[in-house]
């Protein structure tokens, strides 16, 4: 993935970058797959997917255009299908065992997609998982509903140990390491 500014004065860069890329790859006896390679103009509303993320350009709060990348809907759907299968296979098992199985999957998926604009997707996944756990608990007690009055959300995460670290990791928010002071 190579990103180039869309300003008209940089139009010559597209050809130059492609030429240089072909030269460098030829040194390593690697060729560009023309079927998989494409040039996308994000300034004209284009978007592309790469490594499970969808990339496009949006207008930010400060009225400046900025890149936007979030998990693909297909990846979220695949995660939910996998979790649904675990709930289905363990329908008569205690909820603690189900949570032990889904927590590593959730942790890995969230850690991978914890960059970019993933909070809306994380919120959906968290709500979906919470409803499935509540439904599992109610089914074990042969009751209908989701037990909103019976169990507080805090109880699900603290007592049962349901995965709850759906925070985004922003690279720019990490503290910069200060160099060690030099002694004269």
Which residues make up each language-model segment?
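Non-catalytic terminal/accessory segments
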Residues: 1-184
């Amino acid at each position: 993935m190579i990103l180039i500014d869309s300003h008209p004065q940089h139009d010559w860069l597209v050809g130059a970058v492609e030429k240089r890329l072909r030269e460098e790859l030829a040194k390593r006896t690697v060729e560009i797959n023309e079927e998989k390679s494409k040039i996308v103009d994000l300034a004209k509303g284009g978007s592309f997917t790469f490594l499970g993320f969808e990339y496009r350009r949006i207008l930010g709060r400060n009225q400046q255009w900025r890149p936007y990348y979030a998990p693909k809907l297909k990846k979220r759907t695949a995660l939910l299908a996998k979790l649904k299968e675990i709930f289905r296979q363990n329908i008569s098992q205690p909820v603690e065992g189900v949570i032990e199985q889904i927590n590593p999957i959730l942790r890995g998926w969230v850690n991978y997609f914890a960059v970019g604009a993933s909070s809306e997707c994380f919120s959906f996944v968290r709500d979906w998982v919470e409803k499935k756990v509540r439904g599992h608990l109610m089914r074990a007690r042969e009751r209908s509903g989701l037990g909103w009055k019976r169990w507080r959300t805090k109880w699900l995460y603290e007592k049962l140990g349901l995965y709850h670290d759906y925070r985004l990791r922003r690279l720019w928010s990490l503290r910069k390491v200060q160099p060690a002071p030099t002694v004269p």
